[in-house]
Amino acid sequence: ALVGIERFPAQAKQREEMAAYMDEALSEVKGVRVMKRDERHTTRSFYRYIFAIDPQEFGMEHDLLCGALDAEGVDCWTGYNAMHNYDLFQPQKSKLAVPNAFPEYFDFKNMNLPEATRACEHEAVWLDEAIFRAGTKGVDDAAAAIKKIQRNAEELSQAAEELRKKYRK
């Protein structure tokens, strides 16, 4: 365990450098929005790299993009549910002290959170941090896969729709 701690500063620095490299690579992709870095942050630390897509501009929803990225060998996740739909924040389901003590402040089912819903249900794409441990090759491969998927977005969307129709019966 101690050896891992000793390696951490160099690994964190590499992830930070590769995240900046990924930001640059994705800034060229239509319909992709990278997270803006707050200038007050001195270090960028993460276990997942998160970016957003505009489904209309990119050509598909985030779940289809993540499925296609998985097929390309890029570990991907659509992220968490929006807060008002997330079980952890439902006082009737939570064992946490604060939601149980103040359930009136945690009545998320009756809240309208359109930005959170849009981000979580349509836009967010989370990449595994292992991509960044592979150096520029890992980032280049992931960025190339994202660009390839976008070039084929119409065909992939049509295939996905055919599958939805087939299995909704």
Q: Where would I find each of the regions flagged by the language model?
A:
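PLP-dependent aminotransferase class I/II
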Residues: 1-169
